[in-house]
Amino acid sequence: MTNSFQNSRRDLRERAFQALFNIEMGAELLAASQFAYGYDKVTGEDAQVLELPIFLLSLVTGVNNHKEELDNLISTHLKKGWSLERLTLTDKTLLRLGLFEIKYFDETPDRVALNEIIEVAKKYSDETSAKFINGLLSQYVSEAPSANKS
């Protein structure tokens, strides 16, 4: 099996999204992270315990630990008549992941985190959702400059 992931930060963000999505479906955090990271890296006899990259674990653990706060922030930026429950699980997960990195990862410039999550959104959602995610996260970045690193 060929590995289509190269362990770049973008690839690890995508794997974090996959793990977070699986957690929402009932998977355990570490098991979901290990599966998302290693499902295409090892097969059969080559199977081994892979060391998870800190960046991946930090994203998955951080989003999981701050989920309520992230959901509240997302809710405050939704248009009137919209609620968090109305969003698809894919969009909610992407918003949580992008917002977490923007808010808590000082080493990642806000615009980089924003652009990266949009690229993941384009792969796992449709163009309308990618634009929606871009708009909501851009609004957050522009409204809270003192709380962000831009």
UniProtKB/Swiss-Prot annotation:
Parts forming coiled coils: none
Residues annotated as transmembrane: none
Keywords from the UniProt entry: RNA-binding, Transcription, Transcription antitermination, Transcription regulation
Gene Ontology biological-process annotations: DNA-templated transcription termination; transcription antitermination
Pfam families linked: NusB
Source superkingdom: Bacteria
Gene3D superfamilies: NusB-like
GO MF annotation list: RNA binding
A GO-annotated cellular component: cytosol
Similarity annotation: Belongs to the NusB family.
NCBIfam families, per the entry: nusB, PRK00202.1-1
Summary of the function given for this chain in its UniProt record: Involved in transcription antitermination. Required for transcription of ribosomal RNA (rRNA) genes. Binds specifically to the boxA antiterminator sequence of the ribosomal RNA (rrn) operons.
HAMAP family assigned: NusB
Protein's name in the database: Transcription antitermination protein NusB
Species of origin: Streptococcus pyogenes serotype M5 (strain Manfredo)
